[in-house]
């Protein structure tokens, strides 16, 4: 099928893409052809194709006629409610369900039947054949082999505390969760994301729960001003220390945090509080475990995954999906719809998109020219899948949020499908944290150049929205350092009590605030913070593992630090809250252009405006400027935020209660501009508001 698509706007908006027009059009056509095929030549919506989770797995069905009745092992037909279980396993020769209900023994009553030549297997069972809470697996046979497997579509998987083994669990609670808020719509003006991990969301050295997070952490996020949480590690994963990125059961919310109903309540109450909930979804790879995952479900290594060298991810020790298979696309698209519909997630942050886009997974690639995006080394099946996933998400929820974690800079990633892009709403600005780390590590403070900082913060494609951030969970992992730890290091342990700060701590506190303000104030779409980093949470993240004696000491958040009135963490937490409030309280902040007013690299000064807000930064570690003149729109200006305020751990050197008026200059009178004279202390930033006349 060929579909005319003459209006590829991403090419019109970027003349450097013109030489690659044929490739861009081919990729767009591939997605259109896939959509046409999956929707039966546009006879059904894509969301209907993605209903696999309603068909496969374990369900209760209602038989309403003799033809739809249950054929029991005795040959009689039963009516009414009954269990049905289905699995796609084309390579299998026999499948049995084994579990608590049959003593984990293979019996004819629980033997599946192949459905024609589809590769599907099915069994129908009386409603009393199994009950809520019972454990089960599949015994799968194939030519010259056999294995005990967890169903691919299982929606509840638990780990035995004694043996450590995982099994599926019959999940049919008497009290179904009743949603209280079904009409929630995310606030994107702007989108302020709080990246979270349920298990490490508490002070105690253990795994936290959905309920604890809902009761204790959600109120903190509301108070801090964020309007979206990004939940990590929701899909079931065998190894806690993988941070949730080695997924085994894609449809099962991790049971180590609680029940599905408890997760639903968390999301429901977040919505009631005005907080959107997006999921860190992993479709870039899967765990290689055979017993827990999809690796060798029915003896065929290529059932879900690529063949040969492309099967195993060389850096992640995991398996790579074959996005060219219709059944794999069905599985993954159904997974997207499942989380949106069944759990009311508001969207996804797609992990590892770079790994999906390139046959090399982006490893060893430099991405220095446009050739690197269109040289034939891209997985166009993956590009098609990601495009379909975005179309589906926005079809299921028109205001769904989709974010791509992508480091190469692939053009069109966050451009709309109609314009020739892949359809993500946002892409992660992964250059920003790398830049902050680089200058902190490699440049003394007096060498920081505001022009370079400003350029890096605004370095993005003009037609694509981004998520700006100083640091995420990646920068906090063991082996790396958070920004505050790079700035202060071990002095956090000895001089972070208020009144006992040394020069290193004072420097770190000042720069921590300036870095966060500079990053947030230059966003064009969204902003992200990993939980605890807003108040300078100490140390790294290190999940329990053999090398640390399975300790939870560094797999938690010490909220008590920011709650303590005698510690410097309080200053950083209050500053972050007020900074977020300022941006949230500004009408159409992200829709307002960034206008550079002035920079001087020798003086280390930077000033820019967004609407009626003036942002002024003095990165000099030693020089304060009195009566520093900035040519700005004439009028009166009031201080809205000052990193040097005493309440934020600053020195309070300026009187922020003073209204500042511009000085008349005949030379700029026709432009309605005047000179604003300000006192800007060293290593500080101030935000002023131009008042209405």
How should each PLM-predicted stretch be described?
Residues 579, 629-664:
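C-terminal accessory region downstream of the catalytic core in glycan-modifying enzymes
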Residues 87, 196, 221, 231, ...:
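Conserved, mostly hydrophobic/aromatic
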Residues 158, 176-188, 193, 197-378, ...:
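Substrate-binding/active-site clefts of carbohydrate-active enzymes
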Residues 132-133, 657-693:
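C-terminal beta-strand-rich structural cap/linker in extracellular carbohydrate-active enzymes
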Residues 2-71, 79-84, 113-195, 200, ...:
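The feature marks proteins involved in alpha-glucan
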Residues 164, 344-346, 364-552, 584-629, ...:
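Conserved alpha/beta catalytic core and glycan-binding cleft of carbohydrate-active enzymes
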């Amino acid at each position: 099928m060929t579909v005319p698509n003459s209006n590829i706007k991403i090419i019109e908006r970027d003349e450097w893409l013109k030489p690659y027009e044929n490739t861009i059009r081919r990729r767009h056509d591939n997605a259109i052809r896939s959509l046409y095929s999956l929707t039966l030549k546009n006879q059904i919506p894509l969301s209907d194709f993605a209903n696999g989770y309603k068909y496969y797995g374990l369900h209760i069905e209602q038989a309403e006629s003799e033809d739809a009745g249950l054929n029991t092992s005795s040959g009689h037909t039963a009516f009414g409610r009954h269990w049905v279980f289905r699995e796609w396993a084309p390579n299998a020769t026999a499948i049995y369900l084994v579990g608590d209900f049959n003593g984990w023994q293979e019996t004819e009553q629980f033997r599946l039947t192949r459905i024609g030549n589809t590769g599907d297997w099915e069994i129908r069972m009386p409603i009393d054949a199994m009950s809520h809470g019972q454990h089960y697996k599949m015994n799968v046979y194939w030519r010259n082999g056999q294995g005990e497997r967890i169903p691919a579509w299982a929606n509840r998987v638990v780990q035995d505390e004694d043996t450590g083994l995982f099994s599926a669990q019959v999940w049919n609670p008497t009290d179904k969760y009743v949603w209280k808020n079904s009409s929630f719509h995310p606030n994107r003006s702007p989108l302020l994301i709080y990246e979270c991990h349920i298990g490490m969301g508490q002070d105690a050295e253990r795994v936290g729960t959905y309920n604890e997070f809902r009761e204790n952490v959600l109120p903190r996020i509301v108070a801090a001003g964020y309007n979206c949480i990004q939940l990590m590690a929701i899909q079931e994963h065998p190894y806690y220390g993988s941070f949730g990125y080695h997924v085994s059961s894609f449809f099962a919310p991790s049971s180590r945090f609680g029940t599905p109903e408890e997760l639903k309540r968390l999301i429901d109450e977040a919505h009631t509080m005005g907080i959107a909930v997006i999921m860190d979804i992993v479709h870039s790879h899967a765990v290689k475990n055979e017993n827990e995952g999809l690796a060798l479900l029915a003896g065929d290594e290529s059932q879900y995954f690529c063949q040969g060298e492309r099967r195993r991810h060389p850096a992640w020790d995991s398996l790579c999906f074959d996005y060219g298979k219709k059944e794999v696309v069905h599985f993954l698209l159904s997974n997207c719809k499942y989380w949106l519909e069944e759990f009311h997630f508001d969207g996804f942050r797609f992990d590892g998109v770079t790994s999906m886009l390139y046959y090399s997974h982006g490893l060893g690639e430099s991405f220095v020219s446009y050739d690197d995006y269109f040289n034939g080394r891209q997985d166009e099946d993956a590009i098609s899948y990601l495009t379909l996933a975005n179309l589906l998400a926005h079809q299921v929820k028109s205001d769904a949020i989709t974010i791509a974690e992508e480091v190469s800079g692939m053009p069109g990633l966050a451009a709309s499908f109609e314009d020739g892009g892949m359809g993500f709403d946002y892409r992660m600005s992964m250059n920003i944290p790398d830049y902050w780390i680089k200058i902190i590590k490699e440049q003394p403070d007096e060498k920081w150049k505001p022009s370079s900082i400003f350029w890096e913060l605004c370095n993005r494609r003009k037609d694509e929205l981004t998520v700006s951030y100083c640091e995420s969970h990646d920068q906090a992992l063991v082996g790396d350092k958070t920004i505050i730890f790079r700035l202060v290091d071990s002095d956090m342990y000895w001089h972070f009590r208020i009144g006992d700060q040394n020069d290193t701590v004072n420097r770190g506190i000042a720069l921590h605030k300036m870095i966060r303000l500079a990053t947030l104030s230059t966003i064009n779409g969204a902003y992200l913070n990993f939980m605890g980093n807003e108040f300078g949470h100490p140390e790294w993240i290190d999940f329990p593992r053999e090398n640390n004696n399975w300790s939870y000491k560094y797999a938690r958040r010490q909220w008590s630090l920011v709650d303590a009135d005698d510690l410097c963490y309080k200053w950083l937490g209050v500053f972050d809250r007020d900074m977020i409030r300022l941006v949230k309280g500004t009408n159409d902040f992200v829709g307002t252009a960034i206008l550079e007013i002035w920079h001087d690299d020798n003086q280390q000064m930077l000033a820019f405006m967004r609407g009626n807000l003036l942002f002024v930064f003095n990165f000099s570690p030693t020089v304060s400027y009195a009566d520093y003149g900035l040519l700005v729109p004439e009028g009166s200006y009031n201080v809205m935020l000052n990193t040097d305020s005493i309440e934020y751990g600053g020195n309070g050197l300026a009187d922020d209660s003073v209204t500042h008026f511009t000085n008349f200059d005949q030379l700029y009178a026709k432009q309605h501009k005047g000179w604003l004279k300000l006192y800007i202390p060293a290593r500080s930033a101030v935000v002023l508001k131009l008042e209405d006349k």
